[in-house]
């Protein structure tokens, strides 16, 4: 049964009979042109479907697939109403019905989209909160230049200047300028003294846990679009603790490179989707957080990130019902509180850590470029993306 009445979006005096209904507000409309005039409401509907899918509900694949399928069929109906089966008198049979109408290949393609973590691409780009202060996203040009020097050469403390330029800057900007700005976060109201948390002096290896924790923090925030949805809180923290060995497994690292590679290995092994940042982008965001707003308050971003982590882990622990999960969240929260106190009293250690992150970022970029060059050369020799079938050089003739 088609919608009753006239289209609500045609010009006055020219309204045509309504053929479709908005999936969000049930407003009647007659064509693709009028649907586009009502696009904001429909876009909100599809965004809600994506968020429901990311929550992992069992029925959500049908909701999102149905929404996308409906949009496709309505567009086809505008040009080929008879072939698409959406002419007057025919309407989709509901979201669950549309999922059943997908072919096996279409269902498999949609499930691959979800399993690879690419459904988030349907959401508006998200902008990190640490880009919303001062002059915006910034990474020291000196840090990137220092990453190209001999690593055995002593490094002076770099001065804070401008953004990167050229291809590296473009690669370092995974978030669009018109992306959704994250809400600003405040510094923790109270930071305990380090001596009150531990009777013995902190290990010199404590500093290397920061890059590992911040890598997981930046990656998880981008993957979960800011992590503000309470329905995704458990998944958010599970990803965070899996990527950060320092938080999830109380792992100790002997260098910044080791700490970053431990987190990167989780993503490269396919245990979690790479998200909008990927390995290289997450390394770059760690350096940005460690650099802070500038020399006057360099530790501000790191303190804010650790405070945000401690608060988020505390909220997740209140929701957790399994004892083992609650204990794991408790230990991770205590680790964040310890790192918070350590950072507050060791601001001078942040610049060397940021320099190490820039080196790791540059090394990862060089490796990726070399692999791309090698792959291109092999494909040129092979004449395609796969090697040719080996030819038989010596064949034994039948006796």
Curated annotation (Swiss-Prot):
Molecular functions (GO terms): zinc ion binding
Gene3D superfamilies per UniProt: 3.30.60.190
Ranges where the record places region Disordered: 70-97, 152-175
Annotated Zn(2+) 1 binding sites: 7, 10, 30, 34
Pfam family for this entry, one: zf-HIT
Modification N-acetylmethionine occurs at: 1
Residues that bear Phosphothreonine: 161
Tissue: Low expression in most tissues; highly expressed in testis; particularly in seminiferous tubules.
Binding positions for Zn(2+) 2 per the UniProt entry: 22, 25, 38, 41
Zinc finger (HIT-type): 7-41
Keyword Zinc-finger (UniProt): yes
Keyword Transcription regulation: no
Ranges of biased composition (kind: Gly residues): 86-96
Keywords: Acetylation, Metal-binding, Phosphoprotein, Zinc, Zinc-finger
Function: May act as a bridging factor mediating the interaction between the R2TP/Prefoldin-like (R2TP/PFDL) complex and U5 small nuclear ribonucleoprotein (U5 snRNP). Required for the interaction of R2TP complex subunit RPAP3 and prefoldin-like subunit URI1 with U5 snRNP proteins EFTUD2 and PRPF8. May play a role in regulating the composition of the U5 snRNP complex.
Quaternary structure, from the entry: Interacts (via HIT-type zinc finger) with RUVBL2 in the presence of ATP or ADP; shows a stronger interaction in the presence of ADP.
Protein's name according to its UniProt entry: Zinc finger HIT domain-containing protein 2
Organism listed in the record: Mus musculus
Source taxonomy: Eukaryota, Metazoa, Chordata, Craniata, Vertebrata
The encoding gene: Znhit2
């Amino acid at each position: 049964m088609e919608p009753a009445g006239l289209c609500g979006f045609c010009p006055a005096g020219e309204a045509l009979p309504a053929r479709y209904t908005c999936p969000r507000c049930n407003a009647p409309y007659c064509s693709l042109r009028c649907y586009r005039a009502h696009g904001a409401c429909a876009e909100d509907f599809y965004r809600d479907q994506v968020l429901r899918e990311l929550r992992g509900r069992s029925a959500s694949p049908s909701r999102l697939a149905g929404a996308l399928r409906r949009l496709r069929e309505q567009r086809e109906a505008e040009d080929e109403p008879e072939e698409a089966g959406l002419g007057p008198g025919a309407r989709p049979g509901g979201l669950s019905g549309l999922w059943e109408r997908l072919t096996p290949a279409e269902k498999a393609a949609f499930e691959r989209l979800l399993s690879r973590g690419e459904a988030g691409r349907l959401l508006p780009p998200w902008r990190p909160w640490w880009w919303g202060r001062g002059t915006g996203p910034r990474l020291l040009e000196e840090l990137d230049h220092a990453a190209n020097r001999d690593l055995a050469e002593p490094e002076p403390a770099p001065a804070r200047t401008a953004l990167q330029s050229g291809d590296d800057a473009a690669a370092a900007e995974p978030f669009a300028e018109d992306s959704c700005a994250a809400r600003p976060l405040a510094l923790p109201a109270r930071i305990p003294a380090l001596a009150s948390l531990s009777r013995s002096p902190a290990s010199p290896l404590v500093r290397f846990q920061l890059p590992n924790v911040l890598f997981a923090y930046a990656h998880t925030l981008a993957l979960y679009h800011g992590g503000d949805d309470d329905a995704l809180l458990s998944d958010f923290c599970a990803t965070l603790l899996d990527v950060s060995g320092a938080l999830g497994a109380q792992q100790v690292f002997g260098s910044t490179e080791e700490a970053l590679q431990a987190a990167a290995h989780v993503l490269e092994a396919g245990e979690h989707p790479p998200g909008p940042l990927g390995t290289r982008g997450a390394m770059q965001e760690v350096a940005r957080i460690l650099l802070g707003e500038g020399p006057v308050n360099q530790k501000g971003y790191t303190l804010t990130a650790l405070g945000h982590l401690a608060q988020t882990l505390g909220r997740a622990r209140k929701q957790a019902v399994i004892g083992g999960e609650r204990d794991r969240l408790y230990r991770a929260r205590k680790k964040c509180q310890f790192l918070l106190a350590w950072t507050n009293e060791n601001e001078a250690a942040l610049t060397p850590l940021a320099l190490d992150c820039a080196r790791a970022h540059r090394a990862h970029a060089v490796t990726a470029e070399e692999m791309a060059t090698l792959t291109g050369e092999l494909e040129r020799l092979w004449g395609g993306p796969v090697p040719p079938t080996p030819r038989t050089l010596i064949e034994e003739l039948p006796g």
